[in-house]
Amino acid sequence: MGMDYTPRQIVEQLDQFIVGQKQAKKSVAVALRNRYRRMKLDEGFRDEIVPKNILMIGPTGVGKTEIARRLAKLVGAPFIKVEATKFTEVGYVGRDVESMVRDLVEMAVRMVKEEKMAGVMNEAEEEANKRLVKLLVPESKKKPAMKNPFEMLFQSDGSDGDDETTEQDSHDEIRSKRKRIAHQLALGELEDHIVSVEIDEVPPSMFDMLQGSGMEQMGMNMQDAFGQFMPKKKKKRNLPVSEARKVLTQQEAQKLVDMDEVAQEATSRAEGSGIIFIDEIDKVAGKQENAANVSREGVQRDILPIVEGSTVVTKHGTVKTDHMLFVAAGAFHMSKPSDLIPELQGRFPIRVELEKLTVEDFKRILTEPSNALIKQYQLMLQTEGINVEFTDEAIERLAEIAYQVNQNTDNIGARRLHTILEKLLEDLSYEAPEITMEKVEITVGYVDDKLSSIVQDKDLSQFIL
């Protein structure tokens, strides 16, 4: 876990993926560092320190979600993103707000299970190789038991001794074969050999109909209860040794992992370091003018106890939300943060306003991050043997176009660059397998040729860019 990062180090890490938005990065970095500080306090005082939840305000595509997602990945914390508009007030058809906590716990269980399985992978692979040897050289079929009592009377006297000798010879032969096969497996000589492997068959859930109705938890509990009484079905699959080894290693690793211990550690991690990102919070804010807004206020009132700190029942046990970090975000075009109910406003003491992207920001987004868009397209086209180079003037022109289209139509932030680059390189991507040139240079002239007519026609740019 990277909980011991300093705020400055956290911001530096976020800078590798997200351009600008210094204030938002500082706020989340301090919130994360406060968790580390809290863990170093005496246990008696630790429970008194509650996380300072964050409300991010800014248009779409400026980095709100990405900041929270990268932050969680950085420290290995359980993280989920939910949309406030997906929830309904208790009593209505739809998902209830407690499902976000259950989803977070499920995420934590997956994380901890993967970590535990990674820790026993060497031992699991050894066991998998032993099973492979047995599958490649199976036991000889035993002589069928006597079904007729007269067989014992008429059986010749020396047959028992002969059978024992034959059986011993058979065992020795199998042992010798298995030793030889184990050596061949170690050398990788049998990787393409086909072997029959038994795997658990996952039956279709009879409770899928409960999805989205707010009754998922009841469905999961019923399925677990029935699962204990109903034996697991097995099915055989013919796989190459290389694939069979992966399947068997996973099976053996699961046997070595204590799921009770996993559930306990996962709930503890979700409670102490879980991050829940609630997007579109502005869509449930609004003045009480009609019935729809009354329902929105109901969602806010349901979210309130979760954010304040309450106990939620999950299939892995009860989970407290007191020390989870909640990050809410919204564009607030049609409403203001003050339109949220006062109690909920008070639970998000840190307000961060993210800035709109400038031409300079777009230039940096295209080139600076470690996963920059231009790098992505260059690597994709390199697989076809084409090296694509962008001139500085072309990059500047792309940034200007993105900014201009955002100003003239809907402002979708950095996501505009995806659309523009896809349109720019559409022909090149289509013809790439047939192009013999090793290097293609994207100049400002090429950009203007492909995009200027679309940008100038406002109606057309609304549909294409």
Curated annotation (Swiss-Prot):
Pfam family, one: ClpB_D2-small
GO biological process, one term: protein unfolding
Subcellular location: Cytoplasm
Sorted UniProt keywords: ATP-binding, Chaperone, Cytoplasm, Nucleotide-binding
Sequence segments annotated as region (Disordered): 153-175
Keyword check for RNA-binding: no
Major localization class: cytoplasm
Coiled coil: none
SMART domains: AAA, ClpB_D2-small
InterPro entries in UniProt: AAA+_ATPase, ATP-dep_Clp_protease_ClpX, ATPase_AAA_core, Clp_ATPase_C, HslU, P-loop_NTPase
GO molecular function: ATP binding; ATP hydrolysis activity; peptidase activity; proteasome-activating activity
GO cellular component, one term: HslUV protease complex
Binding locations of ATP: V19, G61, V62, G63, K64, T65, E66, D279, E343, R415
Protein task: ATPase subunit of a proteasome-like degradation complex; this subunit has chaperone activity. The binding of ATP and its subsequent hydrolysis by HslU are essential for unfolding of protein substrates subsequently hydrolyzed by HslV. HslU recognizes the N-terminal part of its protein substrates and unfolds these before they are guided to HslV for hydrolysis.
Family, per entry: Belongs to the ClpX chaperone family. HslU subfamily.
Complexes and interactors: A double ring-shaped homohexamer of HslV is capped on each side by a ring-shaped HslU homohexamer. The assembly of the HslU/HslV complex is dependent on binding of ATP.
Protein name: ATP-dependent protease ATPase subunit HslU
